[in-house]
């Protein structure tokens, strides 16, 4: 991707607009200026706390899939077996304690929409291989299942890690990185956006006042 896709210089304006619940048109205008409306996998990079999940939601809301489901899976929060069942679903009797009728995974539930894979760098090699197959042709099998399933799902992923270094170390598949990194956004940390500190502080103050039922306060210099 070109450099203009690799950085959103006004990413915090997206956060401010979302926090104030401005209409979707404003978010769409901000994103349209920085990201092509291409229905392709998107990789969001940035340090912890830069708003990667917020941006994933905004990208979904500005896409042609906006009226369809959006689901999130944090790859660092679940062990491999649970993450596999959550993403791909499982067939009846797949394991002890499985629901009698099986359970659809996020890919099935999100058909026509978007799945956001947060902390994708923490995904195990086994799950990386299953995800790669899905990205190749949209097909997958539930855990313990024999039937091939298909789903039309856009994958948005995010990471704070250097995936290229992980590829060199052998802990992340290079072919999967190519599939995930069709479009890329690099989110700058707030320390590189000092002009946004004031507006963000106002947003947080408004939120705190609303929660406590107090009149709107003002920040002093």
Q: Which positions does each model-derived feature cover?
A:
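A short beta-strand-to-loop transition that corresponds to the Sensor-1 phosphate-sensing loop
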Residues: 119, 157-162
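Short glycine/serine/threonine-enriched helix-capping/active-site loop
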Residues: 73, 158, 185
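Small-residue (primarily alanine) positions within well-ordered alpha-helices
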Residues: 56, 110, 157-158, 201
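ATP-binding "lid"/motif region of the histidine kinase catalytic
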Residues: 73, 138, 143
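Nucleotide-binding/hydrolysis machinery
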Residues: 1, 6, 11, 19-27, ...
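Helical "lid/switch" subdomain of P-loop NTPase nucleotide-binding domains
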Residues: 55, 82-86, 91-94, 99-106, ...
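Conserved post-Walker A coupling segment in P-loop NTPases
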Residues: 14-19, 23-26, 30-97, 108-124, ...
């Amino acid at each position: 991707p070109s450099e203009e896709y690799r950085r959103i210089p006004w990413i915090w304006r997206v956060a401010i607009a979302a926090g104030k619940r401005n209409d979707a048109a404003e978010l769409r205008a901000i994103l349209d200026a920085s990201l092509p409306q291409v229905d392709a996998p998107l990789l969001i990079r940035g340090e912890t706390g830069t708003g990667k999940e917020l941006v994933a939601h905004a990208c979904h809301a500005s896409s042609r899939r906006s009226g369809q489901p959006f689901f999130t899976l944090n790859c660092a929060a679940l062990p491999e077996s649970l993450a596999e069942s959550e993403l791909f679903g499982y067939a009846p009797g797949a394991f002890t304690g499985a629901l009698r009728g099986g359970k659809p995974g996020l890919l099935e539930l999100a058909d026509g929409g978007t799945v956001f894979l947060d902390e994708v760098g923490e995904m195990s090699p086994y799950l990386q291989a299953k995800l790669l197959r899905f990205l190749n042709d949209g097909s997958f099998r539930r855990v313990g299942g024999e039937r091939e399933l298909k789903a039309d799902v856009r994958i948005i992923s995010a990471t704070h890690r250097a995936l290229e270094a992980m590829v060199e170390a052998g802990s992340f598949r290079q072919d999967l990185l190519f599939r995930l990194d069709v479009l890329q956004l690099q989110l700058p940390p707030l320390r590189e956006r000092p002009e946004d500190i004031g507006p963000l502080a106002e947003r947080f103050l408004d939120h705190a006042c609303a929660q406590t039922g107090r009149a709107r306060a003002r920040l002093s210099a």
